Amino acid sequence: MSRYTGPSWRVSRRLGVSLSGTGKELARRAYAPGDHGRDRRGKLSEYGTQLREKQKLRFMYGMTERQFSNLFVRAGKIKEGTHGANFMALLERRLDNMVYRLGLATTRRQARQLVNHGHITVDGKRVDIPSYEVKVGQIIAVRDKSKNLDIIKNAVEAVVSRPSYVDFDADKLEGKLNRIPAREDMNADIDEALIVEFYNK
């Protein structure tokens, strides 16, 4: 299954969650898109509830179904912690997400583009793979040639706060993952237990 590249606001309204993290998609119209959007949300079945939760998280991180399910399987092989929390931590450690969390981009989609276009380095080496798994202590930085990009400077200036599991040097435009993200650090609007139930059926 290919990655969705259409308008994120349509998916946000359909799933009832802000995929950009800004909340703007739902500010004016909190119902699903289309002529019957206001009336479309009836009571979901157990399967429907699990599927919607899975789709919310998958679209939030901008992943294909194959990428998402493969990472879920990997999380299940981690011996410590719960399957759901380990899965969430692996999602957070994707390079595109870390670029977003450091405040080098205003959305995950924008962060993915920065990585794809070669603007980001890890430990001094250019990495253009959004799914690259960042390890604790690795330095994520903007390439010297890219430091004057308005899209990056504007994103850094707009940051209000950063998660406690990252450190950031605004002068150097670089940061790092200082520890594995704990479940309480991450999105409280996601019920990962529903996703575990969905895949374990």
UniProtKB/Swiss-Prot annotation:
Q: Where is the composition biased (Basic and acidic residues)?
A: 35-44
Question: Region (Disordered): which ranges?
Answer: 26-46
What is the protein name for this chain? Small ribosomal subunit protein uS4
Q: Which superkingdom?
A: Bacteria
Name any one Pfam family assigned in the record.
Ribosomal_S4
Give GO cellular component annotations, separated by semicolons. small ribosomal subunit
Mention one GO molecular function: rRNA binding
- The chain positions of domain S4 RNA-binding read 93-156
Organism of origin: Limosilactobacillus reuteri (strain DSM 20016)
List the keywords (alphabetical): Ribonucleoprotein, Ribosomal protein, RNA-binding, rRNA-binding
Q: Which InterPro entries match?
A: Ribosomal_uS4 (IPR022801), Ribosomal_uS4_bac-type (IPR005709), Ribosomal_uS4_CS (IPR018079), Ribosomal_uS4_N (IPR001912), S4_RNA-bd (IPR002942), S4_RNA-bd_sf (IPR036986)
Q: How does it assemble?
A: Part of the 30S ribosomal subunit. Contacts protein S5. The interaction surface between S4 and S5 is involved in control of translational fidelity.
Q: Which PROSITE patterns does the UniProt record give?
A: RIBOSOMAL_S4, S4
The record's family statement is:
Belongs to the universal ribosomal protein uS4 family.
Function according to Swiss-Prot or TrEMBL: One of the primary rRNA binding proteins, it binds directly to 16S rRNA where it nucleates assembly of the body of the 30S subunit.
